[in-house]
Amino acid sequence: MNDLKLLRSKLSTETIEELYKNLNLLKKELFNLRFQQALGELKNTSRFSLVKKSIARIKTELTKRSNSEEY
């Protein structure tokens, strides 16, 4: 739980460019995980949910910032 608070505070301090950079890296990692799973090489399947949740957190932060800039 404490790690989640640290992650959220880290996301709120990153710039938009850094967030997009991290988002692209996570999407590439998710693609690689899917590729490994298709080949039967993936050992740690729980990594899927962690990467997907991280992508969702970054997208949420980006949406929050874009909505706050509109007003």
Curated annotation (Swiss-Prot):
Keywords (A to Z) from UniProt: Ribonucleoprotein, Ribosomal protein
Keyword Membrane annotated: no
Keyword Ribonucleoprotein: yes
Annotated Gene3D superfamilies: 1.10.287.310
Domain of life assignment: Bacteria
Alphabetized Pfam families for the sequence: Ribosomal_L29 (PF00831)
MF (Gene Ontology): structural constituent of ribosome
Biological processes, Gene Ontology terms: translation
Cellular component terms per the entry's GO annotation: cytosolic large ribosomal subunit
Family in the record: Belongs to the universal ribosomal protein uL29 family.
Name of the protein: Large ribosomal subunit protein uL29
Species name: Rickettsia prowazekii (strain Madrid E)
